[in-house]
Amino acid sequence: MEGLLSVALQGAELEGNWKHEGQVEDLQENQESCPEPEAVACKGDPAGDSMQERDEFSRIPRTISSPAATQASVPDDSSSRRCSAPGESPKERHPDSRQRERGGGPKKPWKCGDCGKAFSYCSAFILHQRIHTGEKPFACPECGKAFSQSVHLTLHQRTHTGEKPYACHECGKAFSQGSYLASHWRTHTGEKPHRCADCGKAFTRVTHLTQHRRVHTGERPYACAQCAKAFRNRSSLIEHQRIHTGEKPYECSACAKAFRFSSALIRHQRIHTEEKPYRCGQCAKAFAQIAHLTQHRRVHTGEKPYTCQDCGALFSQSASLAEHRRIHTGEKPYACGQCAKAFTQVSHLTQHQRTHTGERPYPCHDCGKRFSNRSHLLQHRLVHTGERPYRCLQCGAAFSHVSSLIEHQKIHTGERPYKCGECGKAFSQGSSLALHQRTHTGERPYTCPECGKAFSNRSYLIQHHIVHTGEKPYECSGCGKAFSFSSALIRHQRTHADSSGRLCPAPTPDSTPGLSQGGETCQQGCPGRNPRGPAED
């Protein structure tokens, strides 16, 4: 296994190095283009060590070697393909080899006039100069993309052909480049040779380390040309640019919904598969996304890492903090397209839009009543269960809704935090203030569909509507007479009151007609009772 990794790494090194078989063509093209002022005589690709490396590369098994590499015809006259350094005779064109034998480093006689970088071979120097000139002489015939080196074109063309000549012996996965295979192989060995000097985190690929280092340095070299937002890596920039272009290249095969990011598609597909791969170790609750599991764990730990700089409020989620911050800024970025009403949260906008569409997607399974909001359904369910989980600590009164408890507690505190700006009248509830303010504005938003009469309060409309339906839901327990309004029932019940002002109870089979509970005669002439006084003997 180690032998395979070394071979793969050899192939990766050769593939990433300028001494690659594909670059032989580049160097042969460059052999007559060395700078004249330096009297450089480029006679082809450097041999020596590079020939030995190419021989080793050609011996890599076909499962991890490039067919082009094994079939390439490489001339053997390596001695005639050395580049002579300035002022060198052909017999003296290996100064670096003698220095290496003595333990010294190779000479680098070709120096870039733009950046000062030096090279041992003029061909490498010429390839480097294309960085400054921007020259890209190798163009892809399929898409027209151009490259500065033919080896880069060869690698690129595999994106069109789908060729993946480097296969993993362990799992069979294939790759278009040897360096990708070498990196992949580390998933089997667990090797992470590239370690961050700042935090000690290790990575399988040097590119991953380079990207990670930007977390410490704050470097964001990839900037969006449209909005100037900067990113640490190029892939993040490409994904971001889809926001501007509207491109959604990842489509769900089940429902055809499209996404900008492949990760978003993967998360979405779990809706269809119902896969929940992320499980909480404490309560075994499972989640489709790891971010949701991370947030859920804070329920157990009580961790609230996000702090509001204005008021010090703590939050377990960054999104909750962002929404809270709008209380201080007054920002309402989500506007309704029909009435222009704005909201601080997109969920509030979604709920509001249902007032226009009439959509009520949450049905009660007990009575069939439907609701536009899930929280309203949960509150309604308490009607069926009779549960009153919210109890007042001062008087013991219990409530089915926490909002009802909060309003009730103001009875004990006397708090009236909602004050009318017109007349200064204060209220304990915001809804009471809203109703009161309509007395100043004259607003009557509730209209009867039968007769068009408008009301400032929804409850007034409900009471009024009984006039049209003829419904009489309020019945007198004393005489059975029914009324449309509770106020009418209260007025009627006063006709049954005894001399002390107490209401007469409903007659029972065992009670004496015409007598109140205290034995006094009913003075108001209830049906079936004696209005004239006690019964005669």
UniProtKB/Swiss-Prot annotation:
PROSITE patterns: ZINC_FINGER_C2H2_1, ZINC_FINGER_C2H2_2. A zinc finger (C2H2-type) spans 110-132, 138-160, 166-188, 194-216, 222-244, 250-272, 278-300, 306-328, 334-356, 362-384, 390-412, 418-440, 446-468, 474-496. The keyword Cytoplasm does not apply. Residues 63-77, 509-524 have a biased composition (Polar residues). It holds the Pfam family zf-C2H2. It is found in: Nucleus. Gene3D superfamilies: Classic Zinc Finger (3.30.160.60). May be involved in transcriptional regulation. This is Zinc finger protein 835. The gene is ZNF835.
